[in-house]
UniProtKB/Swiss-Prot annotation:
Domain of life: Eukaryota
EC number: 2.7.11.-
Family membership: Belongs to the protein kinase superfamily. AFK Ser/Thr protein kinase family.
Biased composition (Low complexity): 18-57
Organism for this UniProt entry: Dictyostelium discoideum (Social amoeba)
Protein name (Swiss-Prot/TrEMBL): Putative actin-fragmin kinase DDB_G0268748
């Protein structure tokens, strides 16, 4: 059996395959403070390109930022608070602000990042996200409606931050974001105003109180006019000349789900699937962003398997993974068992009918996403990212953050990655179909 590195170095791609697999800094991921309120420093990487070769990625430092452009928020200017349930326990608060107050506070920063070439980090630690920023003025988020943001908290929010960093490396369409922790004065200001503006809705007020018992919130960009997957007119949305491209992008999203233990879930699907199992973590748009994405990943939907490699469940999971990858790479135009299960589930539980023609595009997208994972991710990246994400929080009440990070089982992710690399190497002669 060849080693993982040998298999990586062995892979040679068809000349027709898109060459754009370079790594990217995650845009505006996590932060411990807002604006000038509390500039506590925390660990970060100096991002650099990973477009040379898969094996060279061990020398790459990926940026885990501590600030983002979503800062200096005037929480007193909240006009409404709404709870949005995306399914799979992904509940967000949609915060709407009075435009005149909050836009000025967000955009009128004394920011030098327009003239700064230091790999996406300006002197104020603003993050110039390659995926989301405006080319002419990188300090202002492209397509960002500054009058609204999303808030999310969970007991495993560190998993989300970890996944967002990996998604940023893979150049997925992640929103601008930052982390706000309980030790920050802004956390108190946010809490007070959220409770004030929800006092007339007892259910919402109770929910906010329960969320505020948690120590960390993610503040995320909200690009308006997006629809949830189950709200689409799917026949209309995926028709026309761009329908195939949209399905391929969904396939790339599935590829990351495969890597992070979502698509091949335990117990065997569809026993643990529900009405929001697939694509509950995305917003869909009629028009693409500047990088051509029609989707935005508002939640990682990640669920790491933390168990022994000697258990039956562990091996069953990897066997299902191998079967899926074998099917996709061996017969790219023939529907794999798990893609068929997904389509059947969407039709039965949500009344969503994805056409038979979608199969080829979805599986091409999965293969393209797998190519990117093989190129950009390795065990060093997984471990270094885990360590750096662990260290971005300086005050960790009851070790909540540390425990969440420690539950990320990198050996399992490496085993999954190993299977992906092996299957990709075995059937790379068929990778002509990955062309975007």
């Amino acid at each position: 059996m060849k080693t993982l590195r040998e298999l990586r170095n062995k892979i040679s791609f068809d000349k027709n395959i898109d060459s754009g697999s370079s790594s990217s800094n995650i845009g505006g991921s996590s932060s411990n403070s807002s604006g000038t309120t509390n500039k506590r420093s925390s660990g970060n990487f100096n991002g650099s390109s990973a477009s040379s070769s898969p094996s060279s990625s061990t020398n790459i430092d990926y940026n885990i930022p501590t600030f983002s452009n979503i800062q200096n928020i005037d929480w007193k200017s909240i006009s409404s608070v709404e709870k949005i349930d995306f399914g799979n326990s992904n509940i967000f608060l949609l915060i709407t602000f009075n435009n005149n107050n909050n836009i000025n506070n967000i955009n009128n920063l004394n920011c030098n990042c327009v003239n700064n070439n230091n790999n996406n980090i300006c002197n104020n630690n603003c993050i110039n996200n390659n995926n989301n920023t405006n080319d002419e003025n990188p300090s202002i988020i492209n397509n960002y409606n500054e009058s609204q943001i999303l808030l999310k908290s969970s007991s495993t929010i560190a998993h989300d931050v970890y996944a967002y960093v990996l998604e940023g490396i893979l150049k997925y369409p992640i929103p601008e974001m930052r982390l706000l922790d309980f030790s920050n004065l802004e956390y108190t200001e946010m809490s007070y105003n959220l409770l004030i503006h929800s006092k007339d809705d007892q259910s919402l007020n109770d929910f906010i109180k329960s969320e505020l018992e948690k120590s960390f919130f993610l503040i995320l960009e909200y690009r308006n006019n997006g629809k949830r997957f189950n709200e689409l007119n799917h026949k209309e949305y995926f028709s026309g000349s761009k329908g195939g491209k949209k399905f391929k992008q969904l396939g790339k999203i599935i590829a990351f789900d495969i890597f992070c233990n979502n698509f091949c879930k335990l117990p065997s699907p569809p026993l643990n699937w529900n009405s929001s199992t697939f694509f509950s973590n995305i917003l869909c748009y009629d028009s693409p962003d500047k990088n051509g994405w029609y989707f935005s990943l508002i939640n990682s939907n990640i669920s790491f398997l933390n168990t022994s490699p000697f258990t039956i469940g562990y091996r069953d999971h990897l066997n299902r993974l191998k079967l899926l990858l074998f099917s996709i790479f061996q017969n790219p135009s023939t529907e794999s068992v798990q893609i068929k299960l997904m389509r059947d589930h969407l039709l039965k539980c949500q009344g969503i009918k994805l056409s038979g023609s979608s199969v080829s595009y979805l599986q091409k997208g999965i293969a393209k996403g797998i190519k990117s994972i093989v190129n950009c991710i390795n065990f060093t990246v997984l471990e270094n990212t885990k360590e750096k994400v662990k260290n971005i929080v300086k005050l960790d009440n009851n070790n909540i953050w540390k425990k969440s990070i420690d539950s990320i089982y990198c050996p399992f992710l490496l085993d999954v990655l190993n299977e992906i690399v092996i299957e990709f190497a075995n059937y790379r002669e068929k990778t002509y179909f990955i062309k975007a």
